[in-house]
Amino acid sequence: MASLISFSLLPKPKAVRSSISAPQTQTINTEKLEDKFGRKGIKFSESNNIPMVELKVRNGSSLKLSLSDAHVLSYKPKVYWKDEGFEEVLYTVDGDESRGGVGVVIVNGEEPKGGSSVISGCDWSVKDTDSDAIDALQIELSCTAGVLDITYIVSLYPVSMATALVVKNNGRKPVTLKPGIMSYLRFKKRSGAGIQGLKGCSYCPNPPLSSPFELLSPSEAMKAESSGWFGSEEGEKPGIWAVEDSVITLLEKKMSRIYGAPPAERLKAVYNTPPSKFETIDQGRGLFFRMIRIGFEEMYVGSPGSMWDKYGKQHYFVCTGPTSMLVPVDVASGETWRGAMVIEHDNL
């Protein structure tokens, strides 16, 4: 596979603002972007008045990204050898504001009960694009939120996609952040959804980070199962740690968990870190996708259970992604923090 993500040649810091807050949005001209950044495999356009960019590599695998909110709305890799062997990986819901997909979240870690993402409504701009013989495509977005300069890099390869988050603190004081990259994955059936690779890992029931693209709010994610047919998650209480004892964790029941080392363990010189990757299992389609975390200390896994049909769709969905929620990230003045997520497969 091509070089995963390049963190070099990042945008220079913008003017420092006095607090962590999101600026006003501006109009994005896709025609100008196409002239400046468009190239083979990278196409800028508008869809329903929403500025978009589509990445498509040589084997036909594609990705669609909403430019105004840095929201990945579609990832359709080639997973079968037949001519039309493409499958949508992401679960999205259209509307005034699209939900689901893949999105980045950054919450002010100094707020004890969480809060909204500091980049909600952020003024994103395209900084650069790059390609390698259309077998590796990349687009770089950036925005400023208070004292933070934020760079978001989305990359596409023949059998994988990657999103990378780079946060620079231009303020005079340290900042505490709870970052995450959340993916809403599509499954054909509720009964055929699962993950493998987390056996032996500690986990704790916990609500997800709140975001504009969430399908279930943090309170909905923690709500007990409404139907008795598939059991109840009432036994899982926030703050109570357990160890995953299953080779395959079934996701038909409702759950909202953080997989990672307990905060107290992380104070020790040596402790067990969670696996850097695990696989999703979609038995209905016979597909497997590998979720990889880089730079983050935790993995979130949430399944809707009986609330799966909230949006009236035929497919089941699961929310997962790398995060640093239980132990926030401290970024000193002038310092930079980096994290990334990769979705890859070997279904071919």
UniProtKB/Swiss-Prot annotation:
Domain of life: Eukaryota
Consequence of gene disruption: Malfunction of the NDH complex. H(2)O(2) accumulation in Dark-Light transition.
Coiled coil: none
Transport is among the record's keywords: yes
Transit peptide: 1-17
Topological category with respect to the lipid bilayer: Peripheral membrane protein
Cell compartments where the protein resides: Plastid, Chloroplast thylakoid membrane
A single GO BP: carbohydrate metabolic process
Alphabetical UniProt keywords: Chloroplast, Membrane, Plastid, Thylakoid, Transit peptide, Transport
Matching Gene3D superfamilies: 2.70.98.10
Cellular component annotations (GO), alphabetically ordered: chloroplast thylakoid; chloroplast thylakoid membrane; NAD(P)H dehydrogenase complex (plastoquinone)
GO molecular function: carbohydrate binding; catalytic activity
TM annotation in the entry: none
Physiological role: NDH shuttles electrons from NAD(P)H:plastoquinone, via FMN and iron-sulfur (Fe-S) centers, to quinones in the photosynthetic chain and possibly in a chloroplast respiratory chain. The immediate electron acceptor for the enzyme in this species is believed to be plastoquinone. Couples the redox reaction to proton translocation, and thus conserves the redox energy in a proton gradient.
Subunit structure, as described in the record: Part of the chloroplast NDH complex, composed of a mixture of chloroplast and nucleus encoded subunits. Component of the NDH subcomplex B, at least composed of PnsB1, PnsB2, PnsB3, PnsB4 and PnsB5.
PANTHER family on file: APOSPORY-ASSOCIATED PROTEIN C-RELATED (PTHR11122), PHOTOSYNTHETIC NDH SUBUNIT OF SUBCOMPLEX B 2, CHLOROPLASTIC (PTHR11122:SF18)
Protein name: Photosynthetic NDH subunit of subcomplex B 2, chloroplastic
Organism from which the protein derives: Arabidopsis thaliana (Mouse-ear cress)
Gene: PNSB2
